[in-house]
UniProtKB/Swiss-Prot annotation:
Pfam family, one: Kazal_1
Keyword Transmembrane helix among record annotations: no
GO cellular component: extracellular region
InterPro entries: Kazal-type_SerProtInhib (IPR050159), Kazal_dom (IPR002350), Kazal_dom_sf (IPR036058), Prot_inh_Kazal-m (IPR001239)
Disulfide cross-links: C6-C36, C14-C33, C22-C54
Native species: Dendrocygna eytoni
Site (Reactive bond 3): L16, E17
Protein name: Ovomucoid
Residues annotated as glycosylated: N43
PANTHER family: SERINE PROTEASE INHIBITOR KAZAL-TYPE 7, SERINE PROTEASE INHIBITOR KAZAL-TYPE 7 SPINK7
Domain of life: Eukaryota
Length: 54
C-alpha cells in the first residue's frame, strides 16, 4: 500500500510542481501538498490510491 506522510499539513500555499497522486476518491491531485491538504480537509478519510494520475 502506498502511503504519504501528511503530518506537516495543512499548508496555506502549495507550489505548482506537478507530481500527480491518485486519491481514494478517484481524483488526481497535482502534488503532495494539494493531496495532503485534501486529506486534512477530509478528516483522514481520504487516502492515497497510487502515485501518478488516476
Amino acid at each position: 500500500v502506498a502511503t504519504v506522510d501528511c503530518s506537516d499539513y495543512p499548508r496555506p500555499d502549495c507550489t505548482l510542481e506537478y507530481m500527480p497522486l491518485c486519491g481514494s476518491d478517484n481524483k488526481t491531485y497535482g502534488n503532495k501538498c494539494n493531496f495532503c491538504n485534501a486529506v486534512v480537509d477530509s478528516n483522514g478519510t481520504l487516502t492515497l490510491s497510487h502515485f501518478g494520475k488516476c
